[in-house]
Amino acid sequence: MSASRLDMIFFALRLDNSYIWDRRMENTWHRISESIKEVVPGSVKTIVWMGKITVLITFAMMLLKFFNILPVISDFISPVFKLFGLPGATALAYISGYFVNCYSAIAVISTLDLDWRAVTIIATMVLCSHSMVLETAVLKKTGASVVRVVLTRTLSALFLGFFLNKVLPGSPAASKDTVAQQWTLPFSKTFCDWLIATLKLLVLMAVIIFALNILQRLLCEFGIMDLISRFFKPLMYLFGLPVNASFLWLVANIVGLGYGGAVMLEEIGRGELPDRDVQLLDTHISISHSNVEDLSLMTALGGVWWIILSVRLCAAIVLVWGQRLEYFLRDKYNWQ
């Protein structure tokens, strides 16, 4: 065979391979674009809903702060915090975190003179039950019971605080029963600060929700979700969670319950998770989520990260397996 003929064959093969590659790339981009189009309507709906909830809650919290109502509430319950080995001033940190978010609690904790023991206890309590109003609204949207979520998170926080006070070495922190007076800015300044912060939050929320929903859809489209599920399969069995909830569990632990809930809504909307599996996941992530940024911030304040993380994970495991037992008994004895 002549050299020129071989060159022609090789050239034809290169053209054929190039054509096949182009077709594959064209097909890949088509699948990506279709996946993005599919998530846009649901993402917009979720963003609008979460935006309304966020504006209402943050505005209400701004008023509570402006009129110094949160310090009054914390002063009222501060004696109870002796049960957790905490000074009364930490009540403001817990109440702020409970109704607002972790950052509010962290701001208060940073002003207090607390040792590692006290920071570990209050951090565990805050991470169990922060952003109660917003995150309960998100979980309710997934089908969870509001009463169950509030009781689970609140009682878990109180129990773990009491438990850690009993088992951690060292002495309870010295009692400080008064909370520092809050400086109040003019309402116009307070309102402008709230408006700017809320607008920034809404933009960030929209970007993150779109990005997560697109990522989740692409992972499903290209079969990567199955790999993630197989990788986390042993861990999901330990937690008592369905294997196909691996990605949602991962999202909730990395970016938090609010954004994780947005992805859950997208998943539930497509019927990917049965109701009971959703309830089990809700129970777990309600008290153990945001285990990257929030946990790191609490550690920076002096908390012991592995204690804060492990006690919440253990509590989540107990609660989920207890809920599985409840489902088993309901099915066996036809309980309603």
Q: Where in the sequence are the language-model features?
A:
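Alpha-helical membrane segments and immediately flanking helix-loop junctions
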Residues: 87-144, 239-298
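Hydrophobic faces of alpha-helical transmembrane segments in multi-pass integral membrane proteins
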Residues: 52, 56, 60, 69, ...
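N-terminal amphipathic/basic-hydrophobic helices that include classical n-h-c signal peptides
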Residues: 1-24
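Juxtamembrane "helix exit" motif at the C-terminal ends of alpha-helical transmembrane segments
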Residues: 60-70, 104-109, 220, 291-300, ...
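Hydrophobic alpha-helical transmembrane segments
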Residues: 60-72, 91-105, 145-153, 196, ...
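Selected transmembrane alpha-helices and immediately adjacent juxtamembrane segments
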Residues: 21-80, 154-159, 163-237, 314, ...
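Transmembrane helix-loop-helix hairpins in multi-pass inner-membrane proteins
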Residues: 129-185, 293, 298-330, 335
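Alpha-helical membrane-embedding segments
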Residues: 103-125, 151-163, 182-185, 212-219, ...
